[in-house]
Amino acid sequence: MKIYRKDGIYMKNSSSKASMKMDMLHGSLLDKILLFAMPLAACSILQQLFNSVGTAVVGRFASSEALAAVGSNSSVISLMVTLFSGISLGSNVVIANYIGQQDTKRIPRVVHTAISLALLSGIFLLILGQFVAHPILVLMGAPKDIINLATLYLRIYFLGMPFFMLYDFGASILRSIGDTRRPMYALIVSGVVNVILNLLFVVVFHLGVAGAGLATVGANITSAIQIIYFLMHEELPIRLSLKSLMIDRDSVSKILKIGVPAGLQGMVFSLANVCIQSGINSFGSAAIAGSAVELNYEYFSYYLVNAFAQTVVTFAGQNYGAKDEVRCKKIFRLGMLCSVISCGVLSLFFVIFRTFFIGLFTNDPAVYRYAVLRFLIVLTFEALTSSYEISGGCLRGFGRSMTPAILTVFGSCVLRLIWLATVCSWFHDYKLLMAIYPISWVLTGTMVLIAYFRTRRKLFC
């Protein structure tokens, strides 16, 4: 059926139930950017909140070793899933571009190809995780007192990868048409399931890290079921039919062109963080646990930046498809402003009240000391990540995914590895190890911003 525009909303014709889709091509922008980004931010923050509750349950009702085992896996998990999560971003951009071009005939092929890729990538990660869990933790130098627990958690965690990928790709499809609410609702439900299962498995059944892993798998299954249901009951051309799952070569090519550079960037970025985690491991279990505690709050702040970065990807994607330079410029400015202010305020709030927030996770003085250092050195400057996330998001929306990928790999990955191999090897100091984060953010942000302005001038000249 024909889709038409009414009062800034995409709707099907009056013979069917109205489907609310945000019109990113016309009208005011600030309110729409906020309406799009806030559910995204809430989605990620709620997910992290639920994960933090699970981590706190492990720390309070299991042991410091169990807490360290769970915390030591965050960079490994990120390393192994970011490539495929980046590919899901490719489906978002491709669909957004088609919407901007008003080409609804090719959208169904992208939708069904994306879900097929989600299934294949999830199964691949499930199998890979079982084989590499222990070797990669050994390579990272995980302490002997936690390595067996960390391996167990990681192997259980990856059992849920097919469901995680189905949610990730499905949510990306919905966001491409302006729907950020239903992915949020799905995560709220799965987050509640995660907390309940954590309490059941860890507190009642005393399963420790195994219980935490099983709770995460249960939550992933819950979110995947919901997102697939939403897509199967969506209106054309987004509606999913399991019988129509396919691998369309043209769609795969376009998705991978955008998604692979973004995924590789995230993968190399995560690899650098794995190396930094190895440096953290060298300070012992207290440093690992303290860093894990701070990371919970660091994620909260970063997810605000990431929400606005995802927002500008979709908004820029549609408006670049429509060749609207004025709106593309405004999208960049508003996205950057919202990202810096929101992340900066939340980060400073956490830093000011750090004693209370750290105390929610641990009473161990040694763990507390390391957590405070990371709060002060890293979280204070978290808003700097906006510089490369927002500009890079706009470039991806323009279909130029390789440029921000290369620059971010150099600025935030190569530099960190050089820092580890030189400064941190000369001076075994936790503060110097943490300092690489704000330093790399400044360098990366400067390079990606320059690339954004140069690319935009060329595209619209």
Model-assigned labels for residue ranges:
Residues 88, 157-175, 183-194, 212-227, ...:
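Short runs within selected transmembrane alpha-helices of multi-pass transporters and secretion channels
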Residues 79-82, 194-198, 224-228, 300-303, ...:
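Hydrophobic transmembrane alpha-helices of multi-pass small-molecule transporters
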